[in-house]
C-alpha cells in the first residue's frame, strides 16, 4: 500500500518485504493490503482521538468513507507518478513492443540522474540526429514552446542539477529558449488548487422563483479545493455549471459557510439524499446526491471544513425530548390514538414559551399534538379535504412548528421556524409572521417536487375545540372554514392582519385562560354533534342577536351571515 504496488519488485527485495507468502492473485493482493491498512487506520484513529480530545470524534463509518475517497485519489496519483516513463501500468508484465526490438540500441550516454527534471519522456531520450523537416517535428516544437510549467517545478529543475557539476547547474538557467523570449507567461503560473473532493450533483437554488414554481433541479459539479490564502491555505467550495465549465458559477470560502445540514423529510419529502448549504450573503443551495454513502461523505467533508461536527446535528434530530407529550410513560405508537388529547398544561421549553404567544390566539394552532393526530385531523375526508391545514408544535425539534396540510387525501408536513420577533421561515422563504405565510400559501401553491400536477393551496383549517366536562359520548368533529380571510372572521379579523400578536392582544373569549385547550382541562379534539331540534332552536335564537356578538359556544358560524352553524354546512363533517 505504501509503495508503487504495480511495479515488479526486484528479486533481492522480495524476501525482505514481508515474511508471509506472496499473494497468488490480485484479489488476494488487495485483501492482504486492505487488512493491513485497516489495522493501521484503526490504531491511528484511537491514537488521534486520545491525543486530540478537543476535536469531536467522528463515527468510524464516516472516517472510513472519507478515508476511502482520499485513498482512491492519492493511490491513483502515486501509481501514475511512480510508474516507468512512457509505459502504461496496464502493460506491466508484458514484453516490450515490437518497434522497440527493431530500433537500434542507443550508445552509451550520460546517466539518467544527470538529466534535469522534465514532464515527458521526449526530453529524457538521447538526442536524435536532425532529420528533414516534417509536420510531426513542427508539432513537437510547438508543443514544447506552448507547454506551461507550474511555478513549483522551475526551482525543482534547478535543484536537481545542483548536485552535479557546476557547469550543469549554471547551464540550465542560461538557456531561456524561445518560450522565455516570446511567451514569458507560459513558463510559470499559479499552481491550481488541490481538489479535496469533487462530484457531479443536482442542485437547486432556494429563491423566490423556486418557491413559487417549485424546485428547479440543475446539474453541476461541486468541488472542494484547498487554495492558498493570505493567512495560510484555505478551503474553497466551487460550483461549476455546466459541469465541464472551467470557471465556477458560485465560489465561497468554507469560513463563510454558516450552516450545512441534512434536509429533513418535511422539507424534501420526495428527495431522500439532500443537504442544504447556507453561505453568508448568498442564496441557499440544496444539493442532491445519489445514495446515503455520498451524502454522509459530503457531510463529513463540509462539516470538517466549517469546524462543526456531525454529532451535534444528529443528536438534535434523533434524541427524544423528555417533555414531549405522551412519550414519558409509554412509547408513541401505543398512545397515539384519537381518544387521547395533548396536555398543554405542562412546562414547556423556554424556546416554546418565547414564541407560543404569537400563535396561541389563533384557532388553527393546535399546540403540542402528535404528528399522527394532526395527520388524522386533516385527512378525515380524504381527497375532498384538499388544502385543509393546521399548525402544531414540532415533535422532534422543540421551539419549532409544523404546518400539516391535506394533499389529495395524504397528510403532508412542512416545518416552520419562528424568531423571537415572530418572523416566520418556511424552507428557505422568510415572512414577517405566520399569518403572512398562510396568506401567501393561500394565493400561491405550496411547492412540491412533482411540480404543476401537485398544485395545493391552503383552503381551510381545522379549528381547535374542547370537550365539555362530564361529556362521554363524543364524535370526532374538525371545524374548517373554507374562506378564512379577515372579512370572513369577525372575531379574528383584526388579529389575522397583525404581524405580531402577544397574549395580551388576544380577542375577548380567546385569552390564554379562555382559549379552547388552554384551560385547566386537557385539550380535546372532539365535539358533540347536537340534535336537529337543538340546531333549529339555535338558528331561531341567532336571528334576533347582533352579528358581531362574541362566540358563546364552540360552534363556528358561517362567514357570510353568521346565521348557519358550521356543524351543518361544513362539507368536511364526517358522516
Curated annotation (Swiss-Prot):
Domain SH2: 364-462
Bias (Basic and acidic residues): 83-93
Region (Disordered): 1-23, 83-136, 150-176, 322-346, 503-525, 546-575
PROSITE patterns: SH2
PTM per Swiss-Prot/TrEMBL: Tyrosine phosphorylated by LCK.
Tissues in which the UniProt entry reports expression: Preferentially expressed by lymphoid cell lines.
Annotated disorder: Celiac disease 13: A multifactorial, chronic disorder of the small intestine caused by intolerance to gluten. It is characterized by immune-mediated enteropathy associated with failed intestinal absorption, and malnutrition. In predisposed individuals, the ingestion of gluten-containing food such as wheat and rye induces a flat jejunal mucosa with infiltration of lymphocytes. Type 1 diabetes mellitus: A multifactorial disorder of glucose homeostasis that is characterized by susceptibility to ketoacidosis in the absence of insulin therapy. Clinical features are polydipsia, polyphagia and polyuria which result from hyperglycemia-induced osmotic diuresis and secondary thirst. These derangements result in long-term complications that affect the eyes, kidneys, nerves, and blood vessels.
Quaternary structure (record): Binds to the tyrosine-phosphorylated TCR zeta chain via its SH2 domain.
Family statement: Belongs to the SH2B adapter family.
Designated name of the protein: SH2B adapter protein 3
Organism from which the protein derives: Homo sapiens (Human)
